[in-house]
Amino acid sequence: IVCFVAVFMFMNKHVTYIGYKDAGITIIEDNKDEVTYRTNIKGNYRWRTSLDRETGVMTIHFEQSLWEKYVSCIFYPYDHIHDILKKDEIKEVYVDKDGTTTTIWEAPEEEQKAYLSEEHTEPLG
């Protein structure tokens, strides 16, 4: 039992940052309200986001523990789908571990101007 607990703790503590290239992000739908994209990450994972409401730029990155990669996906498989609500942001950027950024999606210039001309105090979503 002690060995199992030790393995479980190790697999949960060892977290790997997933680079943009390894995430395999593909946009699968872009309509008037939202953009939907899929990742090709094996197993489950978690993500961290930060939205600058003034600029409309959302930053995101994915990370994964060994438990999420090899074990938890058996019990709780993810669909690996993410949505961008266009009313909440005008650009979504992936940030790699070294700080390199890659644009996942960016609104057309006229939508950016409209977003930036409004005050964004309402709740997200």
Regions found by a protein language model. Give the residues of each.
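Hydrophobic membrane-insertion alpha-helices, especially the h-region
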Residues: 1-10
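Short secondary-structure boundary micro-motifs
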Residues: 9-11, 34-35
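Ser/Thr/Pro/Gly-rich low-complexity linker/stalk segments immediately outside membranes or between
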Residues: 10-27
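Polar, acidic low-complexity tracts enriched in Ser/Thr/Gln/Glu with frequent Gly/Pro and Thr-Pro motifs
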Residues: 20, 28-125
